[in-house]
C-alpha cells in the first residue's frame, strides 16, 4: 500500500470546521490522528476549515481549541501558535488557493462553468429519469473565449470546475478499507471554486494537506468518496498525495452519525457533567481500535499502543456504560489531591476545612461524577435524606438496639472498632445484621463507602443525633433480639 512516510517523519492533522461544539465523533477522529503522530514521534497539526463563513462564528473557534486542549490533544502547528506552513485558517489562505487555481486553469485542467443551479438540477433530473447516476455533463467544458466573454458580460459568476480525464481508472488505497477502484468516466467534472470565490472543500483540504506536508490523513468515513477527487487534484498540481485512512463514524443512540449540525452531545457537555478527559481518551481510543492492554492507559501508553492496522471497520455506537467504566478507572488513577482538585469547584464550602483529604480517601471509590461526591458530603456533614430501603433497615430493629448503639458509641470515644465490637457483644448482632442498620441510620443509604472511614467524618455528635433519630422511628417488630 502506498505509504511514503516512515515513522520518523509522520505528520498527521485534525482539520475541523469551526461550525459548532466538538462532539465525540470529532473527538475520536482527532484522537486517532493525534495518537498516530505521537506514537510515531511525528508531528501533529491543527487546521481550521472555516470557509463556511455563515456557520463559523468566532466563539466556535475559541471553544474548539479550548476543548481539544482540555481533551489532552496538543499540536505542533496551528492557528494559535503558527508554524512553518501557515496560516492555519483556510480563510487566510485564499491567495494560496488562487495561485493553484490559476495553474490548473492555464494548463487546461480546470475551466469556468456558468451553469445555473436550475440548469444543473434539470440536467440531474434527466439523468435520473434515464436511470443514470447524476453527474456534470460537461456543458461548459469547451466554451471558447468569446462564449465566456458573453456570459461574463451578462453578469454570470462562474464556478471553477476540475476537468476529470475521460478515461481510465483511479486506484485509491486506504489504510482501513484497502484499495478501491474508480472509473474516471463516472466522476464528472467537479467544482473546486464556488461562484462566490470560496474554495470547495475537496480543493482547499487537499491542497493544504500537501502544502503543510501532511502525509497521513485519518478522518471520518464521510470523506471516503471525496478521496478520488482529491487525489486527482493533487496529481494535476504535482503535489504529494498523503496516505488516507477513513474511520467508521461514531453513531448516536438513533443510529445516525453524530454531527455538529444536529447538536450531538458535545465534549464540553461531558466536561461540564464532570467527565474526566482521561476517561474520554481511554473510552474513545478503544472505540474502533483494538488495544491488547485492557486496563486504564495514560496518553503516552495509548500512543505507544496505537497501530493503524488495529483500526476496525465496524461502525461504533456511543455507549454510556462503557464511558462510565472508563470514568471509574480514570478517577481511581488519580491521587487524592488530584481528586480533590477535580471536585473542589462543586464542593468548596461543603467539606469542613482540614477534612478534604480524609473525605476524598473515604468516598473516592464510590464516585463517578462530582455530583456523587456532593451527595456524600451532604451525607457526612449535612442532613442526609433517608432512602426507602434505609428506613426499612432502621425500623427492622428494635428501639433498644439504637439506645445501646448510642451508649456504646459514647463509651468508645468515637472509635469505630471499639464501638462496633461493643455493640456486637451487647446486641448479639453481627455481620450484615449489625452493619446494615448502622449504615442506614448514619448515611441514609444501605450501600456506600466503608463505615469505618465515614464515621470520623460524620463525627460523634452528628452520629449520636442520627442514632437518636433512628430510635424514634416506630419499629416494625420482625425480631425480638435487641
Ligand atoms: N460521527 C462522526 N464520527 C467520527 N468522525 C466524525 C463524525 N462526524 C465528523 N467526523 C470527523 O470529524 C472531523 C471534523 O469534521 P467536521 O468539523 O466537518 O465535523 P461534523 O461533525 O461533520 O460537522 P458538520 O455537522 O458541521 O458537518 C472530520 O474528520 C470528520 O470526518
Ligand atoms: Zn457549466
Curated annotation (Swiss-Prot):
Locus of motif 'HIGH' region: 16-26
Keyword Transport: no
Reported cofactor(s): Zn(2+)
Catalytic activity: tRNA(Glu) + L-glutamate + ATP = L-glutamyl-tRNA(Glu) + AMP + diphosphate
Annotated ATP binding sites: 260
UniProt entry tagged with the keyword Cytoplasm: yes
Main subcellular location of this protein, as a coarse class: cytoplasm
GO MF annotation list: ATP binding; glutamate-tRNA ligase activity; tRNA binding; zinc ion binding
Comment on bound cofactor: Binds 1 zinc ion per subunit.
Subcellular location: Cytoplasm
PROSITE patterns: AA_TRNA_LIGASE_I (PS00178)
BP-aspect Gene Ontology terms: glutamyl-tRNA aminoacylation
Gene3D superfamilies tied to this protein: 1.10.10.350, HUPs
Cellular component, GO, one term: cytosol
Residues the entry annotates as binding Zn(2+): 113, 115, 140, 142
Sequence motif: 'KMSKS' region, positions: 257-261
Keyword annotations: Aminoacyl-tRNA synthetase, ATP-binding, Cytoplasm, Ligase, Metal-binding, Nucleotide-binding, Protein biosynthesis, Zinc
Enzyme Commission number(s) from the entry: 6.1.1.17
SUPFAM superfamilies from the UniProt entry: An anticodon-binding domain of class I aminoacyl-tRNA synthetases, Nucleotidylyl transferase
Function of the molecule: Catalyzes the attachment of glutamate to tRNA(Glu) in a two-step reaction: glutamate is first activated by ATP to form Glu-AMP and then transferred to the acceptor end of tRNA(Glu).
Quaternary structure and interacting proteins, as annotated: Monomer.
Family assignment from sequence similarity: Belongs to the class-I aminoacyl-tRNA synthetase family. Glutamate--tRNA ligase type 1 subfamily.
Record's protein name: Glutamate--tRNA ligase 2
Amino acid at each position: 500500500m502506498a505509504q511514503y512516510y516512515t515513522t520518523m517523519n509522520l505528520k498527521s492533522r485534525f482539520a475541523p470546521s469551526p461550525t459548532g461544539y466538538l462532539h465525540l465523533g470529532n473527538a475520536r477522529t482527532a484522537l486517532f490522528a493525534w495518537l498516530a503522530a505521537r506514537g510515531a514521534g511525528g508531528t501533529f497539526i491543527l487546521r481550521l476549515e472555516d470557509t463556511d463563513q455563515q456557520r463559523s462564528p468566532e466563539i466556535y473557534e475559541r471553544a474548539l481549541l479550548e476543548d481539544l486542549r482540555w481533551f489532552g490533544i496538543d499540536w505542533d502547528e496551528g492557528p494559535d501558535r503558527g508554524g512553518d506552513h501557515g496560516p492555519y485558517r483556510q480563510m487566510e489562505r485564499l491567495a494560496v488557493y488562487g495561485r493553484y487555481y490559476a495553474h490548473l486553469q492555464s494548463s487546461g485542467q480546470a475551466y469556468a462553468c456558468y451553469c445555473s443551479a436550475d440548469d444543473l438540477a434539470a440536467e440531474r433530473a434527466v439523468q435520473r429519469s434515464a436511470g443514470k447516476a447524476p453527474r456534470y455533463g460537461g456543458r461548459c467544458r469547451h466554451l471558447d473565449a468569446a462564449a465566456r466573454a458573453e456570459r461574463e458580460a451578462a453578469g454570470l459568476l462562474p464556478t471553477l470546475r476540475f476537468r476529470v480525464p475521460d478515461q481510465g481508472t483511479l486506484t485509491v488505497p486506504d489504510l482501513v478499507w484497502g484499495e478501491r477502484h474508480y472509473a474516471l468516466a463516472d466522476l464528472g467534472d467537479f467544482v473546486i471554486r464556488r461562484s462566490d470565490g470560496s474554495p470547495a472543500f475537496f480543493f482547499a483540504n487537499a491542497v493544504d494537506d500537501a502544502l503543510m506536508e501532511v502525509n497521513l490523513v485519518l478522518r471520518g468515513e464521510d470523506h471516503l468518496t471525496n478521496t478520488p477527487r482529491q487525489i486527482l487534484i493533487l496529481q494535476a498540481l504535482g503535489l504529494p498525495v498523503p496516505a488516507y485512512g477513513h474511520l467508521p463514524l461514531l453513531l448516536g443512540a438513533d443510529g445516525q452519525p453524530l454531527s455538529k449540525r444536529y447538536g450531538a452531545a458535545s465534549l464540553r457537555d461531558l466536561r461540564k457533567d464532570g467527565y474526566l478527559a482521561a476517561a474520554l481518551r481511554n473510552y474513545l481510543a478503544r472505540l474502533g481500535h483494538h488495544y491488547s492492554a485492557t486496563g486504564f492507559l495514560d496518553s503516552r501508553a495509548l500512543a505507544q499502543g496505537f497501530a493503524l492496522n488495529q483500526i476496525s471497520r465496524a461502525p461504533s455506537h456511543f455507549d454510556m456504560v462503557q464511558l462510565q467504566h472508563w470514568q471509574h478507572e480514570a478517577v481511581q488513577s488519580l491521587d487524592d489531591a488530584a481528586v480533590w482538585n477535580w471536585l473542589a469547584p462543586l464542593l468548596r464550602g461543603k467539606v469542613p476545612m482540614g477534612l478534604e483529604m480524609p473525605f476524598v480517601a473515604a468516598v473516592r471509590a464510590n464516585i463517578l461524577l462530582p455530583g456523587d461526591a456532593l451527595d456524600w458530603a451532604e451525607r457526612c456533614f449535612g442532613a442526609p435524606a433517608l432512602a426507602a430501603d434505609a428506613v426499612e433497615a432502621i425500623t427492622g430493629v428494635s428501639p433498644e438496639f439504637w439506645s445501646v448503639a448510642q451508649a456504646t458509641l459514647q463509651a468508645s470515644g468515637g472509635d469505630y472498632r471499639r464501638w462496633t465490637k461493643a455493640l456486637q457483644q451487647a446486641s448479639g448482632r453481627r455481620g450484615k445484621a449489625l452493619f446494615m442498620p448502622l449504615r442506614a441510620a448514619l448515611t441514609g443509604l444501605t450501600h456506600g463507602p466503608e463505615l469505618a472511614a465515614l464515621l470520623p467524618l460524620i463525627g460523634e455528635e452528628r452520629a449520636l443525633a442520627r442514632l437518636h433519630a433512628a430510635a424514634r422511628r416506630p419499629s416494625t417488630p420482625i425480631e425480638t433480639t435487641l
